[in-house]
Amino acid sequence: MKNIVIIITVAVLFNLFGESLQMVPFETYPLNQDDSKYDCLTNGYNPYCQDICKLHNTKEGYCKKFFCICEKLSKENVKFLAEIIDTCNERLDEIL
């Protein structure tokens, strides 16, 4: 009986831990309004990608295969900057 409880507990903890890892992958491409990736010219450390990633609520970013990559970018923040731009454009349309 104790073995079953231990197995169930381990399975539940493993499932919860696995879900949390899926929510924050190590590196993810941030996306523009049209779901395209941000282009960059210099692979490796790249100030432009650093700025893009900071605007997407992450601390670290670099250029990989000529696209910006952000470390630990959550699913909610993949299009974070695009959502802000959309909101601003909607407000401008209302004003004008």
From Swiss-Prot:
Name of this protein: Neurotoxin 23
Tissues/organs with expression: Expressed by the venom gland.
CDD domains xrefs: neurotoxins_LC_scorpion
Signal sequence segment: 1-22
Keyword Secreted carried by entry: yes
Principal subcellular localization: secreted
Natural source organism: Lychas mucronatus
Listed InterPro entries: LCN-type_CS_alpha_beta_dom, Scorpion_toxin-like_sf, Scorpion_toxinL/defensin
Residue intervals of the LCN-type CS-alpha/beta domain: 26-89
Bridged cysteine pairs (disulfide): C40-C63, C49-C68, C53-C70
GO CC entries: extracellular region
GO molecular function: sodium channel inhibitor activity; toxin activity
Domain characteristics, as noted in the entry: Has the structural arrangement of an alpha-helix connected to antiparallel beta-sheets by disulfide bonds (CS-alpha/beta).
Location of this chain's protein in the cell: Secreted
SUPFAM superfamilies the record matches: Scorpion toxin-like
Keywords, comma-separated and alphabetical: Disulfide bond, Neurotoxin, Secreted, Signal, Toxin
Similarity-based family: Belongs to the long (3 C-C) scorpion toxin superfamily.
Origin: domain of life: Eukaryota
